Design a protein with these regions (language model features):
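Bacterial Sec-dependent N-terminal signal peptides
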Residues: 1-35
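Catalytic loop of the DD-peptidase/beta-lactamase superfamily, centered on the K-T-G motif
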Residues: 24-79, 211-214, 220-224, 228, ...
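Active-site-proximal loop and beta-strand segments within enzyme catalytic domains
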Residues: 58, 82-199, 216, 251, ...
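Alpha-helical scaffold elements that line and support the substrate/ligand-binding pocket
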Residues: 66, 71-73, 97-120, 124, ...
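Short, solvent-exposed turn/loop segments enriched in Gly/Ser/Thr/Pro and often Arg
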Residues: 70, 74, 125, 132, ...
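Secretory-pathway/luminal and periplasmic proteins that interact with or process carbohydrate-rich
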Residues: 75-77, 132-140, 150-157, 229-239, ...
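Glycine- and aromatic-rich loop/turn segments at beta-sheet edges
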Residues: 79-81, 189-191, 235-241
Length: 371
């Protein structure tokens, strides 16, 4: 082998090694994490230990913003990992992208319009659209809200398009593309009336259709129907409004990453919010006089023996116990909201670590364990 060829191959090996190292990133070591989390009134030592046992699996700069709701009181607890040390911080007013947890709020808008008799849950959405659905498909509001429409998780061809913006996959999914999909590409992944299939595009179409029903933008509907009445001052789909509060998202390697733009389907996951604001929403869900939230909590579909669907909510069943929940995940953040209406208890968990991190599922588990 000549010297030039040898050095060329050596360089290629070095480049390949560096690419692999960059892709893998540094692995956070749970055993190296130092626990400096402080006690707090209203949060048990067991709960604090659960927070430590979860956060220690994530890289430096990962933080949790947690709200404990009990009856009419709320206790906040913040934690961050820096220099392999876990410490307590005050981040209850910090804004996080909540991802698919936004679907709960889209369903709240649906329930609110239903209470006002502006639509019927069993009504096909076609009546409110100014374009035909492909093959004259009949899809109802309820089916979109409880994931029984038969629509796929993402629109056809989206995977290839998203490769152009891997850190912000929905960035270019504008209204023209959505309308073209609905009229010319829409097809059911499952046509069975008893099938359940989680659908991001279904939630996006629901949010889009609701704007046609109400004659207002998705953001305007959120502010006027939910956020303003509940005094959720730092919740929005317009990130620039809360830019000074935004927590930096981390990808699965622990490096800073961008928030997601949802284009024409904000109803699928565009909201940013705070633990403080989400606690207000949780409390509202315990109000027996809130007709829209009462309607939203009604069971609409039985998935299996372990869980049901309400409008936007998952319902976990354990004997006669029913826990309402929804999680959210993007390329840089992971969230969880858990409610137990019977005992008027709830938990909010916001984090700034990617849903693609191999331990991201521990954050959902933490939400249940803290309840």
């Amino acid at each position: 082998m000549d010297i030039l060829k040898h050095h060329t191959i050596k360089r290629l090996y070095v480049i390949a090694f560096l690419v692999v190292m960059i892709a893998c990133g540094s692995e956070s070591n749970p055993e190296s994490a130092i626990n400096n989390l402080e006690p707090r009134a209203g949060v048990s030592s067991t709960q604090i230990d659960s927070i430590f046992q979860t956060l220690r699996y994530f890289p430096n700069q990962t933080q949790f913003s947690i709200a404990f709701i009990a009856d009419s009181s709320v206790t906040f607890y913040g934690a961050i990992r820096t220099n392999d040390t876990l410490r307590t911080i005050n981040n209850k007013s910090k804004a996080f992208e909540i991802g698919s947890l936004s679907k709960v709020f889209t369903a709240t808008l649906l329930a609110d319009l239903a209470v006002e008799d502006k639509l019927q849950l069993e009504q096909p959405i076609q009546a409110y659209l100014d374009l035909p659905l492909r093959d004259s498909l009949q899809i109802t509001f309820k089916q979109l809200a409880n994931h029984t429409s038969g629509l796929p998780r993402i629109p056809s061809g989206f995977i290839w398009e998203s490769l152009l913006h891997m850190n912000n996959p929905y960035k270019d999914y504008d209204e023209d593309k959505l309308r073209n999909y609905m009229s010319h590409e829409l097809e059911l992944a499952d046509e069975s009336e008893t099938a359940w299939q989680y659908s991001n595009i279904g939630a996006g179409i629901l949010g889009y259709t609701l704007t046609k029903v109400d004659g207002r933008s998705y953001e305007e509907m959120l502010q006027q129907r939910i956020f303003d009445p509940l005094n959720m001052q730092h919740s929005t789909t317009q990130r620039e409004w809360v830019e000074d509060r935004l927590v930096t998202g981390l990808n699965k390697r622990g490096n800073p990453t961008s928030y997601w733009d949802l284009g024409a389907i904000p109803g699928a996951g565009a909201i940013v919010s705070t633990a403080e604001d989400l606690a207000k929403f949780a409390l509202a869900n315990f109000d027996p006089n809130n007709e829209a939230l009462r309607l939203q909590q009604q069971k609409t579909f039985t998935v299996n023996s372990d869980w049901d669907m309400a409008l936007g909510w998952f319902i976990r069943k354990q004997n006669s116990d029913h826990v309402y929940w929804h999680s959210g995940g993007t390329g840089g953040l992971r969230t969880m909201l858990v409610l137990h209406p019977e005992s008027k208890k709830g938990v909010v968990v916001l984090s700034n670590i990617s849903s693609g991190h191999k331990h991201a599922g521990r954050i959902s588990s933490l939400g249940f364990s803290l309840l």
